[in-house]
From Swiss-Prot:
Similarity field: Belongs to the UPF0421 family.
TM helices/strands, residue ranges: 16-36, 55-75, 102-122, 128-148
Name of the protein: UPF0421 protein OB2406
GO cellular component, one term: plasma membrane
Alphabetical list of InterPro entries matching this protein: ArAE_1 (IPR010343), UPF0421 (IPR052984)
Species annotation: Oceanobacillus iheyensis (strain DSM 14371 / CIP 107618 / JCM 11309 / KCTC 3954 / HTE831)
UniProt keyword annotations, A-Z: Cell membrane, Membrane, Transmembrane, Transmembrane helix
Domain of life per record: Bacteria
Coiled-coil region: none
Compartments, record wording: Cell membrane
Topology versus the membrane: Multi-pass membrane protein
Length: 346
């Protein structure tokens, strides 16, 4: 476990794949160099990527080997052969959209120039077989040895995102409802950008796990992961609504002290629940949603008395209320899904 955490699972798997590939090639009596090169580049973050890219790298390597044999036959072992092998391999792979196999194909092509001396056709097929060995061994190692499992990592990130989002919800509404804090708005924008990056990283891991779920997950595990993905989706939409609030053009906020305190109270409640400082209670959510809806319709009725010039854009008071109602509903959805996840775990 210490070794795995120190150098990483992919590095360990790459080393094992290289070792097994070299042993197999030595046992058959073939040079392991090309098989090892293929094995190194085939270990991907997910098993599905290893298989998908392997199916691209095999024909790409065949193209590289074919060009190497062709130009060796025409020009012998010369600088021209190296150049033409590289150029034609890159061009052909690019034209055929074999982008994931371009690097290994080019390396195979130029490396073959120095090792082929006779029997060109036999050398070509040997390279295809060694490439197949490298692809197969790496894919099997990636699938069965320390298989990629991002679920715990994603779950940890989801929890961290929820807590940070809670801080931002409370901080942004406090900032907007206090004139002396309005200068801190840019600080919250920067924090929202950082939070967006964290969400994107979690979404990338989620895609990795989704791609590999058909290889390793039991039905129960798939349900758990589906719940975690749904929670991440709700957090993404919360972030979107919060960004809408802070990005909306602002003028002087026309809101009385009672309404201001209600907004601050609800934003603080959401923050405490997301940060797990307060236990989630669906009745509390319903109560706060009812009060916010009353404020929203009251504010909307007030805007009917405004002039048409003032209604060219939605009043910021309505924006704050609408977005907070949306965030509150998403908070309820988030914890409903979290409770489902706990039930599935049991």
């Amino acid at each position: 476990m210490k070794l795995r955490s120190f150098i990483g699972s992919r590095v360990i798997k790459t080393g094992i794949a290289v070792l097994l590939t070299a042993y197999i090639c030595e046992w058959i009596g073939w040079s392991p160099v090309f098989a090892v090169i293929t094995a190194i580049v085939t270990i991907e973050p997910t098993v599905s990527d290893s298989i998908r890219k392997g199916l691209i790298r095999f024909p790409a390597s065949a193209i590289g080997a074919a060009y190497a044999v062709l130009f060796i036959a025409l020009f012998g072992n010369s600088p021209v052969t190296y150049a033409l092998s590289a150029v034609f391999t890159i061009t052909t792979c690019f034209r055929l959209k074999l982008h994931d196999g371009l690097l290994v194909a080019t390396i195979t092509s130029v490396a073959m120039v120095d090792v082929i001396h006779s029997n060109y056709v036999m050398e070509f097929f040997i390279r295809l077989f060694t490439t197949t060995i490298g692809l197969s061994v790496s894919t099997l190692v990636n699938m069965f040895l320390l298989p990629p499992d991002y679920q715990k990592n994603i779950q940890t990130k989801v929890s961290s995102i929820a807590q940070e989002l809670g801080k931002q919800i409370q901080g942004i509404y406090y900032c907007l409802l206090h004139v002396d804090e309005i200068n801190n708005e840019s600080k919250y924008l920067d924090k929202l950008l950082e939070l967006d990056k964290l969400i994107i990283r979690a979404e990338i891991l989620s895609r990795y796990q989704t791609n590999d779920s058909k290889y390793h997950f039991t039905e129960n595990n798939q349900e758990k992961f589906k719940d975690i993905k749904t929670q991440l989706h709700f957090l993404r939409i919360m972030h979107y609504h919060l960004t809408n609030v802070i990005d909306h053009p602002k003028e002087q906020i026309n809101i009385d002290e009672k309404e201001k305190n209600e907004l601050l109270n609800v934003s603080s409640y959401i923050a405490q629940v997301l940060k797990k400082e307060l236990a989630y209670n669906s009745d509390d959510i319903q109560d706060k949603r009812t009060r916010l809806n009353e404020l929203f319709w009251k504010e909307k009725h007030r805007t009917h008395n405004l002039s048409s010039d003032m209604l060219n854009k939605l009043p910021f008071e309505l924006v704050m209320l609408y977005e907070l109602i949306s965030i509150l509903e998403l908070t309820e959805d988030y914890f409903y899904t979290a409770n489902l996840h706990k039930e599935n775990a049991n």
